[in-house]
Amino acid sequence: MKTIGILTSGGDAPGMNAAIRAVVRTGIYYGLKVKGIMRGFAGLVEDEVIDLGLSSVGDIIQKGGTILRTARCEEFKQKEVRKKAYETLQKHGIEGLVVIGGDGSFRGAQLLSEEWNVNTICIPGTIDNDIPCTDYTIGFDTACNTVIDAINKIRDTATSHERANIIEVMGRNSGYIALYAGVAGGAEMIILPEVEWSIDELCDKITYGIKRGKLHHIIVLAEGVMSAPELAKMIKERLPKLDLRYTILGHIQRGGAPTVMDRVLASQMGARAVELLLENKTKRVISIRNNQIVDDDIDEALSMKKEFNRKLYELSKILSI
């Protein structure tokens, strides 16, 4: 193997640049040429390929986003479009492809491997932490820290005004950001897609807190359950005198300098991706489990089910009495 390529696909996540840096530097260390594909699979189809060298990845480990840009490519579901992507790889002599992204990105890599025998290695990069085969995805820790910073600031003003605040966080159909940030932020209530909840129980908890002199109430809401305005309306219908505000954090959770954890995780995964290609392995997804970097067959990785951390959720209920 002489030349490898790398792309980032789907939603961006802090730490992607650290992974790109690791792939490029490890590849060069082992004597490989490294090509960058701009804008994910869309750029692969459109032949947007650049050379990546040591200077290309200098001064990027601390930056959020991705220097390769990213885009969603619905057209990639069509076989004739995927053929164009394969032709781009052939044109540039790319013998191995590293794909950083979520499960949709992995499925794109899976199809390239199955249809055109492309050597592919996948790295989980998504703030949602919803990839079943790995304990943590690149970007999750940074996103949680961003949410924590917001919770801390919102609590300051909520306490001053004796208010309740709903904070809506990202995660699609996964409640991991809400759960981890909610526990770390001392939220009074965490509402997740994975757990049944009751609006009456929530309102009773707020009422009890007010009676015992509590100055604020922080409710962390995962976007996959409902929107913050919808929840606010439900609460106000039952507690019309409650001073209630809501904040939708939105895409601020995707940006910012990656944390130490995300930089180290991305560096480990990026280096391992190159090593796997040099070992002639393909269709692998790199993960971290029990603090060890491991890899799984992509078919198995996509069929796994993410285990919800119910113990942590139960702990959140104990700590929020």
Swiss-Prot record:
Enzyme class: transferase
CC terms in the record's Gene Ontology section: 6-phosphofructokinase complex
Subunit structure: Homotetramer.
GO molecular function term, any single one: monosaccharide binding
Coiled coil region boundaries: none
Similarity section: Belongs to the phosphofructokinase type A (PFKA) family. ATP-dependent PFK group I subfamily. Prokaryotic clade 'B1' sub-subfamily.
Keywords of this entry: Allosteric enzyme, ATP-binding, Cytoplasm, Glycolysis, Kinase, Magnesium, Metal-binding, Nucleotide-binding, Transferase
Top-level division of the source organism's lineage: Bacteria
GO biological process assignments: canonical glycolysis; fructose 1,6-bisphosphate metabolic process; fructose 6-phosphate metabolic process
EC number: 2.7.1.11
Record: residues binding substrate: 126-128, 163, 170-172, 223, 245, 251-254
Binding annotation for ATP: 11, 72-73, 102-105
Name under which the protein is recorded: ATP-dependent 6-phosphofructokinase
